[in-house]
Amino acid sequence: MGLEHVLLACIAGATVIGMSKRQPFPEVSQRFGIVLLLIGLIGILAQNAPEPPSDRFWQSAFTFVGGLGVVVGMRHLAYTRMDVLIAPFSGILLCVGSIGLLWDEWGVLTEFEQIAAFILAAFLCTGEVYLVFRGLLIGRLPQAWSQAGLRNLQRGLIDGPNGALSCFEKAWDVEKEHLNPMAYLALQRITAAKGHADEANKWAERLIEQGGE
């Protein structure tokens, strides 16, 4: 069973790194993905040892890493608003690790403890569904895209998939309309400086619709 845990860590790490390219600050989730890949690679080496790690070791490791990742991910999801990937992927590890530990102890638990363990497992799964829904399905980071646009503008990265133009084009939000004029103004100034009159006029009209400068 240890090999399955190793594969899960590697797949999760590679997926996070791949999806991080579509985040305003890709380095945040990339670091987490690299940590998962390192855990997986170390696990591959450990599985070939004379005494490979037990399932309980992997379950405990996933519970610890997943729990810590959920805390860090929720901070980014709700406070810094810089990343939406760490929390849901950490939740997967937390569910796999903690539910695995409960399953191994199921036979020696009393009836009351089994009920409590079942409620805990259901709570963890419900929390993971929320993290996936909140982070991967509806997670939007308009403020972070604006910040990333300003950072890339200072670095001189204007064009391209991760350039300032692309970032500001994503920095709008229906619920937080106060962010939209800043994005429109930045887009109007950048396109005007590049000599794209039609694009500049389009963003200028959007800016006027929001009340102007």
Language model regions located:
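Helix-turn-helix repeat elements of alpha-solenoid scaffolds
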Residues: 120-124, 153-166
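TPR/TPR-like (Sel1-like) alpha-helical repeat modules
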Residues: 172, 188-213
